[in-house]
């Protein structure tokens, strides 16, 4: 898996709107047959997000499978300027590349991990759909279900998750602290209810369980969490903890 961070001089435009525009730009760079293929996938092999800083704007693209990386990576590296509909042409100031391999994830899983508390920062609006309805407050079950589905489909090529494992994870994890706010993500004319902020939870159980959680969350920093991660929703990062 690769992470590409495109840095621009700060763009004074809402990050959520930019994320959708950048996604449209990305699709324009790809072969139309491949774009059609992507639209048919149950879980997209990429995730994006836009992060606004004080002096710059970053467009982050995660390539989550080897096949998608082979088709997209070199195209992305050649991008020097970006045109987003009604905005002035944007010049790329720099591109940073990071990598997360399956071997690194396996190393985390096999480690003597004994971290009990984990903190997730929801950088972009994050949301779930359950039984046909939007969910604007996270539960541990929804968090783990999303991560396990993405990991299973994109890394292990397994379309279905193990419900027993999901049950066990959910039963042994408890939200201990949160600071969340309602946030809406607009896609064209649709406003999707979601949330942003920070959540801390505790995992009780064997070291193997805690290591599995750490592996899933590390993967989640690339895959995103919840729905519409290819459009810019569900961008997360882990907060480093000492306990």
Curated annotation (Swiss-Prot):
The gene is cas6. Belongs to the CRISPR-associated endoribonuclease Cas6 family. CDD domains: Cas6. This is CRISPR-associated endoribonuclease Cas6. InterPro entries: CRISPR-assoc_Cas6_C, CRISPR-assoc_prot_Cas6. It comes from Streptococcus thermophilus. Pfam families: CRISPR_Cas6 (PF10040). One of its GO terms (biological process) is defense response to virus. Its EC number is 3.1.-.-. GO terms for molecular function: endonuclease activity; RNA binding.
């Amino acid at each position: 898996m690769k992470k590409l961070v495109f840095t621009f001089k700060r763009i004074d435009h809402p990050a959520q709107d930019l994320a959708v525009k950048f996604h449209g730009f990305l699709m324009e760079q790809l072969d139309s047959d491949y774009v059609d293929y992507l639209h048919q996938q149950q879980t997209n092999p990429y995730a994006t997000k836009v992060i606004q800083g004080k002096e710059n704007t970053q467009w982050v693209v995660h390539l989550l499978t080897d096949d998608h990386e082979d088709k997209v990576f070199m195209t992305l590296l050649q991008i020097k300027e970006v045109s987003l509909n009604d905005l002035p042409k944007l010049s790329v100031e720099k591109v940073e590349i990071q990598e997360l391999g399956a071997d690194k994830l396996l190393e985390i899983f096999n480690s003597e991990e004994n971290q009990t508390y984990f903190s997730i920062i929801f950088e972009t609006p994050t949301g779930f759909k359950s039984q046909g309805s939007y969910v604007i407050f996270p539960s541990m079950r929804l968090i783990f279900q999303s991560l396990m589905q993405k990991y299973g489909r994109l890394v292990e090529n397994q379309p279905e998750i193990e419900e027993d494992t999901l049950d066990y994870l959910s039963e042994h994890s408890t939200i201990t602290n949160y600071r969340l706010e309602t946030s809406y993500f607009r896609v064209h004319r649709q406003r999707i209810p979601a949330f942003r902020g920070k959540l801390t939870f505790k995992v009780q159980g064997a070291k193997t369980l805690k290591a599995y959680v750490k592996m899933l969350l590390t993967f989640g920093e690339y895959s995103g969490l919840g729905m519409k991660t290819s459009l810019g929703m569900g961008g997360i990062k882990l907060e480093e903890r000492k306990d």
